[in-house]
A protein has these predicted regions:
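Surface-exposed cleft-lining segments at the edges of enzyme active sites
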Residues: 75-80, 105, 158-175, 214-217
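A structural signal for short, well-ordered beta-strand segments and their strand-loop junctions
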Residues: 98-104, 129-133, 189-195
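Short, solvent-exposed loop/turn segments at secondary-structure junctions
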Residues: 76-78, 106-109, 135-139, 196-200, ...
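Serine-esterase "nucleophile elbow" of acetyl-processing enzymes
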Residues: 49-111, 116-123
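Short, amphipathic alpha-helical "lid/cap" segments that border enzyme active or binding sites
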Residues: 110, 114-117, 222-233, 237
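N-terminal secretory targeting modules
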Residues: 1-70, 123, 128, 134-166, ...
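Extended hydrophobic/aromatic segments used for targeting, binding, or gating
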Residues: 93, 201-222, 228-229
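A short, acidic, amphipathic alpha-helical segment used as a generic capping/interface helix at domain edges
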Residues: 172-184
Length: 241
């Protein structure tokens, strides 16, 4: 069975971590002093547990794929800045009263989301529904031979030096999305949205707006996750889930 591509940045590190990266704790302490005891995250402990593929989920071979909803995306799906009980996929699971599999991979783009979608389609039992929360339409993955076997892709955003605008990633990613829509058409409930306003506009999908912020002050907070989960659930139910 071909394995899905997860968050390679966490592979090779402990599977359980208290911070997203090496700078997160310092940033949190600064935010704690500034925002004070009324801040939701002031005394809230968060642990990030990852499976052997780098997903914030149980091991792939233990999942009941055929009776689950699968959510694919970037760090907003994986729940950076939030405790597992507060992230959108956990809340969606509570609303739908069925398993929800989190295939969020931090920092990744539409290309990897579509690769995982294809691997899901070809290798795993067909789920009850698929949700694509599209990342920035400008991001892309680049294969690297300099990294070890578990970290073969690096991900580029427009503000980073290696970014190659000549490849016209907006148009490429639009084609990835079109292919993914065709892949799942008429097979199951399929819902698309994005937290990125430009992506939502270009792809003509729902824009899941940011209402509050997580502990890292960069991602959705608890209220945003609740709103996202409710929107996803409503749209899946409209499709017969």
């Amino acid at each position: 069975m071909r394995k899905l591509l997860g968050d390679k940045g966490y592979l090779g590190r402990p599977k359980s971590r208290d911070w997203e990266d090496d700078t997160s704790e310092k940033k949190y302490r600064k935010s704690r002093r500034k925002l004070g005891p009324d801040w939701y995250f002031y005394d809230k402990r968060i642990t990030f547990d990852y499976n052997s593929n780098g997903f914030r989920a149980p091991e792939l071979d233990t999942m009941d794929w055929a009776n689950s909803v699968v959510v694919i995306g970037d760090s907003f799906v994986s729940g950076d800045g939030n405790a597992i009980e507060d992230i959108a996929t956990t809340l969606l699971q509570d609303i739908l009263e069925m398993p929800v599999i989190n295939l969020g991979s931090s920092g990744t783009g539409i290309d990897l989301a579509c690769w995982n979608s294809l691997l899901l389609h070809e290798t795993y039992p067909r789920p009850k529904a698929v949700v694509q929360l599209w990342s920035s339409i400008h991001r892309y993955a680049e294969y690297s031979t300099e990294r070890n076997e578990r970290s073969v892709y690096s991900f580029h955003l427009p503000q980073r030096k290696p970014y190659c605008a000549k490849h016209n990633w907006d148009e490429r990613n639009k084609m990835y999305v079109l292919a993914d829509r065709v892949l799942w058409k008429d097979k199951l409930p399929y819902y698309e949205a994005s937290v990125f306003d430009v992506t939502a506009k270009v792809l003509e999908v729902d824009h899941l707006k940011e209402i509050d912020l997580g502990r890292d002050l960069d991602h959705w907070g608890p209220k945003s996750n609740i709103a996202a989960a409710e929107t996803i659930a409503t749209n899946l139910k409209k499709q017969g889930l």
